[in-house]
Amino acid sequence: MSTPGAQQVLFRTGIAAVNSTNHLRVYFQDVYGSIRESLYEGSWANGTEKNVIGNAKLGSPVAATSKELKHIRVYTLTEGNTLQEFAYDSGTGWYNGGLGGAKFQVAPYSRIAAVFLAGTDALQLRIYAQKPDNTIQEYMWNGDGWKEGTNLGGALPGTGIGATSFRYTDYNGPSIRIWFQTDLKLVQRAYDPHKGWYPDLVTIFDRAPPRTAIAATSFGAGNSSIYMRIYFVNSDNTIWQVCWDHGKGYHDKGTITPVIQGSEVAIISWGSFANNGPDLRLYFQNGTYISAVSEWVWNRAHGSQLGRSALPPA
């Protein structure tokens, strides 16, 4: 059965999430094309037609990144398949960001990933999307306008894109990791400040369904060490997790939780193994009330379990 609230959520909606520790924000699209915000501040709230931050092409991807919750950026596509940005700054509230004015044209089936560069107080953004020629393009904000960055080469048309940024404690600048599909492989490209973009593609999974959702997070950055978790929807209609752990590389791959076919996925994390963490939160659609967004939780105390079965407005 459904609920009136769940019926407002687009089936296979794009999903994005940001956080400052356990203060959570989740973004999704409603059936009218509006992008809504649900929030967790001790309990779940919002997600109604009063919590719309902007409008996008129906079926648009939704990506988000934040500096804590003081600065939030949400990315979607316009009807004309150009990138657009909804921005929140504490003290200002929501407004239309500058990216839309750049009129960056992307493929109509492009997905989006977004990161604030880690380890700096400056608001530096990197957006990843697929151009009409099916290459993955980086778009950069360094405070002086939006510009095209590095082109990361060809990818499967309509590939999911996951990205994360972190800062090794012994490196002078942020690192970036991005994941997408070439043919059916899931691959990683890497950027480190002393090397730039490494030319090689690292395969993390040999065969995944075409256009599967991809989401990624990182935590526990240390001296040339990082922990990363990458998620995608496999052909068994469950979310799979691929782990990168310091000293082990990519090692642990396995199923997490069932989803609807074609579900999108968002992941957030906080804390680290060194400090009795991390905490992981995964957002997806698994058929609860047909189209509600659901939550999966991992923490050290309880391990893997389902969290909130249906986020507001469901």
Swiss-Prot record:
Residues 2-314 are annotated as: 6 X approximate tandem repeats. Alpha-L-fucose 3 binds at residues 126, 138, 150, 197. Alpha-L-fucose 5 binds at residues 229, 241. Keywords: Lectin, Metal-binding, Repeat, Zinc. Alpha-L-fucose 4 binds at residues 177, 188. Lectins have particular value as specific probes for investigating the distribution, structure and biological function of carbohydrate chains on the cell surface of animal, plant, and microorganism because of their specificity for defined carbohydrate structures. AFL is suitable for detecting core fucose on cell surface glycoproteins. InterPro entries: Fungal_lectin (IPR012475). Zn(2+) binds at residues 243, 245, 251. Alpha-L-fucose 1 binds at residues 25, 37, 94. One of its GO terms (molecular function) is metal ion binding. Pfam families: Fungal_lectin (PF07938). Gene3D superfamilies: Fucose-specific lectin. It comes from the Eukaryota. Alpha-L-fucose 6 binds at residues 44, 281, 295. AFL adopts the six-bladed beta-propeller fold and contains six binding sites per monomer, each located between two adjacent blades. The six binding sites that are non-equivalent, and owing to minor differences in amino-acid composition they exhibit a marked difference in specific ligand recognition. Belongs to the fungal fucose-specific lectin family. Homodimer. Multispecific lectin that is able to recognize L-fucose in all possible linkages. These could be found not only in decomposed plant matter in soil, which is the natural environment for A.fumigatus, but also in various epitopes on human tissues. Mediates binding of A.fumigatus conidia to airway mucin in a fucose dependent manner. This is Fucose-specific lectin. It comes from Aspergillus fumigatus (Neosartorya fumigata). The lineage of its organism: Eukaryota, Fungi, Dikarya, Ascomycota, Pezizomycotina. The gene is fleA.
